[in-house]
């Protein structure tokens, strides 16, 4: 699943289904497929939307989630993800991990350590924590989301302080 933004006059050229927000006769908010001429069931030969049922189910689930969160909720989740990832990167740096890339990042980042990735992740697993993704012997890809609390991150850091 992905999100794409474009200027209004390009909406007929981008791939995928477009969902629009509308209001019904009773003033209730509703979401509908817009520009249906792009859809397979209207103009198969020129369709820019090619979605199968399992993708549509994922899109429906995300639509419900995003609708429930609203505009500010979606932004708040993004801010939480970013701030928690930067917090974790900073804390990992304090205990000897180095950032692989000196670039901006959102909620995923790669660290390098003198301790083996396997040893680090095994120690976390022993504490019922699913750590990052090992990229090789010394590098790990970490990810933080809105579901990770600062207490969770601090617990990971405290456990990693014990790894030698």
Predicted regions and their residues:
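Conserved C-terminal alpha-helix-loop-beta "cap" of PLP-dependent enzymes
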Residues: 72-155
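Active-site C-terminal subdomain of aminotransferase-like
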Residues: 1-95, 99-102
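C-terminal alpha-helix
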Residues: 159-163
């Amino acid at each position: 699943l992905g999100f794409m933004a474009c200027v209004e006059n390009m909406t007929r050229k981008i791939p995928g289904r477009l969902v629009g927000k509308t209001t019904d006769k009773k003033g209730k908010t509703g979401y509908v497929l817009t520009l249906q001429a792009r859809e397979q069931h209207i103009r198969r030969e020129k369709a820019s939307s090619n979605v199968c049922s399992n993708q549509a189910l994922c899109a429906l689930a995300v639509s419900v989630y995003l609708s429930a969160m609203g505009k500010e909720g979606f932004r708040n989740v993004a801010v939480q993800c970013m701030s928690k990832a930067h917090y974790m990167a900073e804390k990992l740096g304090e205990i000897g991990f180095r950032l692989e890339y000196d670039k901006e990042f959102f909620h995923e980042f790669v660290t390098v350590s003198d301790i083996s990735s396997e040893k680090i992740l095994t120690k976390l697993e022993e504490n019922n924590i699913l750590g990052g993704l090992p990229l090789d012997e010394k590098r790990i890809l970490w990810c933080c989301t809105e579901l990770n609390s600062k207490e969770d991150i601090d617990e990971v850091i405290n456990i990693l302080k014990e790894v030698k």
